[in-house]
Amino acid sequence: MNLERLNEIEKPLLHIVKHDVVPALGCTEPISLALASATAAKYLGKTPERIEVKVSPNLMKNGLGVAVPGTGMVGLPIAAAMKVLSNTILIELLIISALLHQKVCSISTDRLSKL
């Protein structure tokens, strides 16, 4: 792409795309919840005994039936729990990709409270 030919509107947009768009694995809703729970667990400093999350109606609607990569499970409860119950490193929005090679079968939806 010839940057000299970009107009004044296109240049800032291209800058945003180049610097602010990051890779993500999975769908937005489960990833956002996994990222939030991972961040909370990081600041807590230990594995929480219980996870309680509050989400918007739109996130709930869009995320309840979404498959969480590497788990064979669907929904927001597994997305919220999987990072907290693992000991993997938070890698920005690739949080779920770090778990693909780990056993997540031990995470049972019976152990998860409904949102």
Swiss-Prot record:
Any one GO BP annotation for this protein: L-cysteine catabolic process to pyruvate
Lineage, top ranks: Bacteria, Pseudomonadati, Pseudomonadota, Gammaproteobacteria, Pasteurellales
Superkingdom of the source species: Bacteria
Disulphide bridges: none
Protein name (Swiss-Prot/TrEMBL): UPF0597 protein NTHI1023
Molecular-function GO terms, alphabetical: L-cysteine desulfhydrase activity
Family as reported in the entry's similarity comment: Belongs to the UPF0597 family.
